């Protein structure tokens, strides 16, 4: 009669650390395997292209406030939740990051709002 997985797991669960160590050594000897972690090699060449495709966090940077600074300040306040003075200082100090570590959809939405207000925006 075959032993069920649940029976094996229950037996292992009741073992001490020393007993588990001896069990691992017995498996290594019996089956000729190693319990050492296997190092996985990274992709060779084309790594930069793969990294660019996998980018999931973006930074929205206010490059320039443009002619309609008041609208840009309002948009910055709406996006960041900053007070009037903080938003004005941020807009006056352009180029500055507005949002950092956001997903692509949020970055594009922020860019759209700021551009509609008259600002020049970059998404990095």
UniProtKB/Swiss-Prot annotation:
Q: Which GO terms describe its biological process?
A: translation
Q: Which family does it belong to?
A: Belongs to the bacterial ribosomal protein bL12 family.
| This protein's name | Large ribosomal subunit protein bL12
This protein's species is Burkholderia cenocepacia (strain ATCC BAA-245 / DSM 16553 / LMG 16656 / NCTC 13227 / J2315 / CF5610) (Burkholderia cepacia (strain J2315))
Q: Which Gene3D superfamilies does this chain map to?
A: 3.30.1390.10, Single helix bin
> Could you name the domain of life of the organism this protein comes from?
Bacteria
Gene Ontology cellular component list: cytosolic large ribosomal subunit
Carries keyword Ribonucleoprotein? yes
* Top-level taxonomy: Bacteria, Pseudomonadati, Pseudomonadota, Betaproteobacteria, Burkholderiales
Q: Which Pfam families match?
A: Ribosomal_L12, Ribosomal_L12_N
